[in-house]
Amino acid sequence: MINFALLSLIHSADGKISTRAKTPAHFTSRLDLERLHDIRKQADAILVGRNTLEADQMTMTIPGLSPQEQPWRCVITEKGLLDPQHPFFQSAGGSRHIITSSIADLSSFPATIHQFDLAEWLSWLDHETQIETLLCEGGGELVKNLFQLNLVDTIHFTLASHSIFGGQKAPGITGLPGDYLPASRHYHLDILEEGAEGEFFLTYQKG
């Protein structure tokens, strides 16, 4: 049963999680990367969207932990378009899970395939597994969907005050500008720490 859903995101001084070209989120310090790994250790499963996986060339692993100690590595893809040579499929780590509502044949991939949309998969995760804490690392469209479902309990932000991306086509934490959420979501600032090189680490809790 899922007890907690977490977000871990980096955003620029103007609230953008990437540039308009969707460049990799590699603009923060080593201390921020260490913090990300510490946050991952809180999770039983990590979830990202396909575009984020591709842009950041993610393995979704935690250094120093055996594969048995690693959280599940989960990727959601609407069309089932994945590269079998991606580092995600070539690295040792937690079990791989692909979530897709597509009818694409993904049986050749070294992963468990879930023919669900996001809400269906989350329901399955909640009722059929022992996963208690789910961590989402983006992208913005996936984050917006979780906010729409009102499932986000904790938000970990890294504020990279040294960078400004600008532009309507640079995604914010809920993706590109679009429809409003069905209702406002309310959080309070729980932790604020100064990091390195003009970065600040913030943690928000629901309610």
Please state what every model-predicted region is:
Residues 1-207:
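Enzymes that bind and transform nitrogen-containing heteroaromatic metabolites
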